[in-house]
Amino acid sequence: MELVVQFQVLNQSCQCLAWKPHPATAWGTESQHVVAGYSDGTMRVFSISRTEMELKMQPHAAALTAIAYSTDGEMILSGGRDGLVAVSSPRTGMTIRVLADHKGFPITVLQCTRKQYHDFGVEGGELWLATSSDQRVSVWASDWLKDKCELLAWLSFPAPAGPKGFGSLPPSLATFCPWDPDTLVYVGFGVQKEALFYNLRKKQVVEKISLPYFATSISLSPAAHFMAVGFDEQLLRLLHCPDGAAQDYAGHDDTVHLCRFAPSGRHLLTASHSAVLVWELTGS
């Protein structure tokens, strides 16, 4: 691995990053744009091929905590420490919508996925979710070109009274399930240490998988029914779904604060303090 380009913004901390999705006609080529969210509420779009910043926007007054491209790459969704979610166009540099449903609680996750246009009885070719640190998840259907954005589900997962301050609690995390597009998976501070599978059609939790600790990171394989979960206890667990068969892995010297499956599902990336580990799945 070698460093090919570096972008630096003086006096600001980069809080979140997202690659622009591949155009449907150019699958197999590497996306050449990334968007970065910063501690001053700005976000910047960088061109890798031209090694330059193409756009700077400030849709937030508070630090950005989560960022994602829409599935077609035409919009950028950003979430702030104040709980606001902004939708901005990288073509025009304008913020077209601000959603305040999670106001007051930092946004921890933003994720977009495709859907059939009239699926779930609402118009829009995209589903997206926002998760905030108060154990709440909102799911939306959108068609940004028609200025459509409709709330599909508002989920609140029960949790006991915890210590004051979100930084002392395990993060609230949610992700769409790659092998079941009607389902999302949630982990976070709660009554039990578990991963919850919530079905958007049935409007209920359809599966629970017990965990040894509260999760600090999660990723689902797009290629097989595997879920990777990281913990504060320097542990990585690989789970087969739905039976919950588990395999634990050591090798981290701190909290496993990030885990991401590669699109092929054959490799898993994990991060712990200053170390980045790459795992290869064999026999799966």
Where are these regions (language model features)?
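WD40-repeat beta-propellers
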Residues: M1, M43-S47, V85-P90, V137-S142, ...
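Short coil/turn linkers that define WD40 beta-propeller blade boundaries
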Residues: M1-E2, T51-E52, G93, L145-D147, ...
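Short C-terminal beta-strands that terminate individual repeats in beta-propeller domains
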Residues: L3-V9, M53-P59, T95-H102, E150-F157, ...
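Canonical WD40 repeat/beta-propeller blade segments in eukaryotic WD-repeat proteins
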Residues: N11-A26, A62-Y69, G104-G121, A161-C177, ...
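Conserved loop/turn motif of beta-propeller repeat scaffolds
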Residues: P23, E30-S31, G73, Q116, ...
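Hydrophobic beta-strand positions that form the internal "hydrophobic ladder"
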Residues: V34, I76, W128-L129, L184, ...
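Conserved strand-to-loop turn within each blade of WD40 beta-propeller repeats
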Residues: G37-D40, G79-D82, T131-D134, V187-V191, ...
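Blade-level signature of beta-propeller repeat domains, shared across WD40, Kelch, NHL, RCC1
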Residues: H257-S284
